Structures are given as structure tokens and as C-alpha cells.
Amino acid sequence: MRAYERLLKYAKVYTTSDPESGTHPSAAREFDLAHLLVEEMKSIGIEDAFVGEHCYVYGNIPATKGCEKKPALGLIAHMDTAPDAPGENVKPILHENYDGGDVTLPGTGMVMKTSTFPFLKELKGETLITTDGTTLLGADDKSGVAEILTAAETLIKKKLPHGKLCIAFTPDEEIGEGASLFDIPGFGADFAYTVDGGDVGGIEYENFNAASATVTIHGFSVHPGSAKDAMINASNVAMEFHMALPVMARPETTEGYQGFYHLCQMYGDVTEAKLGYILRDHDASKLQFKKDNLLHIACYLNGKYGPGTVEVEIKDSYRNMLEKIKPHFHLVETARKAIEKAGLTPEEIPVRGGTDGAVLSWKGLPCPNLGTGGFNFHGVCECTTVERMDKATEILLNIVELYSK
């Protein structure tokens, strides 16, 4: 079975994670795909495959004769899809011999324009996979799951030489919980790759340092007819707080290594208002500056409106994996060779986000990220191609081969 065929099957299983649940996994529906994968893994020869109580799927392929002393390599992908767009009743559509032009998604009439998505022109002649426009596709990261299992099936069927291969599929990556209960000792790998990136040929070993902040503003309500010099409108103070942050440090005004403050949520009335932010920067010192800046703004507003008017709660989320990858840079060098062997040019760009691998790297499992061949994640214009998924699978096989020598 080719990787895209697996993706078409997995995409139809509803696995959107739930950021509000507070449970592990965040949604019981994630077990539906987990059980399907365990069954499939056993059918291709991964005899010890199982899913644990928190919806982590694990399985191992023992080393072939003569490769027992080679390092144990891990491959990891996540099963959940992002809650940013609908993920139920996904209807994948194959556009064979795609002409490189605008694509109309029939479920909504939405048009994926090449002027908006210039990369589409580069996909001309390939078999493009989209949805009907009513849901996301789930290529993030069911394409990674599909590519790992297709590579595993190839290794077993063709009896290719390899060291121990450790496979894991995680829940809740999209809500930042994918690595929280990952069993690194039980997984058994010396190092690993997550297969959760964008276009095929990508290698990601730098990511944001991340934090979140909740700003709570306590107002004082007075009848508006007699409010002069008495009312403190929490919603107005919230707007004042937000406008004190730099306009040019927002997601929509930054790129590359530029960090940002992102206002994700806001609500309020006269009595109370709340602002929810995520803070991101590749440089840990610059992230600390952003955290300090929020506190300084709160201090200023408390001086203006009274102590306790503004409260800021900051939580660290994940850290840049680069520091933990540098001592194991063979992972990057091997990935480069594997990509070149597949006839592609490696592309190494900083991740403007995070991966399970970033958290796992800091927990002791060095884990850069590889491209899957997908585009436009987290939205209804998400897409991939048959050919790029095949290439991603080939790259995984090349990595396994290189570590077996």
C-alpha cells in the first residue's frame, strides 16, 4: 500500500483534539485511529504494537541479523488534527495530473488561488490531494503516520537490513500535549525523528521558545450616568494593555527568526476582561524580554488605575530544540544525505512553531523534524500530493539504510 492510500483512510477518522478537556487524551475519538493503527501495524508484522491508556501507540521492528548493535532509531508522528478547522466527515479529493492552476473546492466553492498560494504552481503534473473545502485534510500529521507505516511495511516485506526501529504515534500534539506523557524509556530509541513538517525535503531542528500569558483585568462598575472619575472599564483597560504591545511584533508582521506576541482570545465587560496570548521567539533571551514587557505594562497600568487592576499569569510551554540537537548533529547530517539520495535538495529553515520533537529533545530524546510533503496545515485549504508523500517515504527508508551501515 502506498502512503497516500493510507492517508485517504486515516483522514476519514475524526481525531480533532480538544484544548478545553483537560484529559489525556483530550478526546476519546482519538482512540478510533489508534486502534486502527495497532491492527494495521500487527498485520504488516509489527507484532508488539499496542495502544496505552493515554492513547499513545508504540511498536518495534527488531534489528535484522548483523545490525543488532546499530543504534535504535525512532520515528514519530501524531494522530490528532488541529481544532482550528472542522475535522469531521473529511472528504479527500484527488486531482490527477494537476495543471498548476487555481483549484475550486466543490463543497464550498472556495477557490485556492495560485496568487494566494504560489507553491501550487510547483505541483503541476502531480496528483494533488485536497478536501472538498468543508474541513481540513489532516495531512498534518496523518501523512506522517502514513509515511512511517509505509516505510515500515517496505522494510519488512523486502527484508531490508536495519537496526532496531521504534515507532510511536501520539495524541494531542496540536494542543501542545503530544509529548507530555510519552514513555521515552519504554520507546527504546537512542534518537528519533518526528515526521510532522511541511514540504518534502525539509529538515527542522530549530523551533520557537514558547510561553503563554493570561492577562486578567479587574474593573469597577458604576452607573454610566455618574461614572466620571469613578468607573474603571475593564474592557477599555484591556484594549490599552494590548495597544501597548508593538504592532510590528505580531504573527502577521513577522517571519523567519522574528518573534511575536499573539492575541489568541479576548473577552470582557466593565467588571472584568481577559486577554490570552502566546509568546514566541527562537532566542530565549528575547522571549524573556517579551515576558518581562507584559509585566512592565501591567505594572504601569496598576500605577494608573490602582494596585491589582491588572494581573498577568505566564506559563512556559516548550523550548528551542537546537541546543539539544547540536551534540547529536549526525541526525541532521544523515537527513541531508537521505534527502539528497532521494534526488532533492535539503531545506533547513527555523520552525515558526513547535513539535513533539522539541519537547522530547529536552526530555532526553534528540528529535529533529522531517517534511511530509504537505501544505496549508490547520485550514480547509490543506493539501499534499501523492508524489511528495512517496518521496517522504523514500527519505525515511534512506535514513534507516544509512543508520544500518
What positions do the PLM features span?
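N-terminal capping segment at the start of a domain
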Residues: 2-28, 129-130, 318, 378-379
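Short, conserved micro-motifs enriched in small and acidic residues
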Residues: 28, 135-146, 228-236, 383-390
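Active-site metal-coordination/substrate-binding segment of hydrolases
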Residues: 67-161, 169, 189
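A non-catalytic alpha/beta surface segment that caps or lines the substrate-entry region
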Residues: 22-70, 74-76, 80, 91
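Phosphate-handling active-site elements
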Residues: 153-166, 247-254, 405
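Midchain, well-structured core segments that form catalytic/ion-binding scaffolds
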Residues: 111, 117-120, 126-139, 172-299, ...
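Short beta-strand segments
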Residues: 74-78, 168-170, 193-196, 216, ...
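Metal-dependent amide/peptide-bond hydrolase catalytic core
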Residues: 235-405
